[in-house]
Amino acid sequence: MDKVVKIDGKDVKFRATARTPRLYRAIIGRDMISDMNRLQKAFNPDNAEESNLDVMNLQIFEDTAYIMARHANPDMEEKSADEWLDTFNMFSIYEVLPHILELWAINTRQTSTSKKK
């Protein structure tokens, strides 16, 4: 699934598919599912500014945003999250993270019903 988010006055396209966790592991070197579980637990969608977002959670957010943007734009010139973040003057975690979590939730929700009762 794709989603366009306005960041620092620019339209940025993000993509989350079954391939996204593989890209994350190959490029970032960590398990995306574990990282996203940690990030989801720390983020309070009802009051974003009261979320428990430490330095590691910020790193996970930045890496995830970069991977989803790179997945949507394979010809992206920036080869690291740091290079990509340098293209923005302002990149608010509180504005972008809800969109990233929404994409992740849509991508990971169960699409079939369990046959066990």
Where are the language model's segments positioned?
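Charged interaction scaffolds used for protein-protein
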Residues: 1-11, 30-53, 59, 71-117
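N-terminal first-folded block
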Residues: 21-28
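Short linear motifs in exposed loops
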Residues: 15-17
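Generic secondary-structure boundary signal with a strong preference for alpha-helix termini
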Residues: 20-21, 41
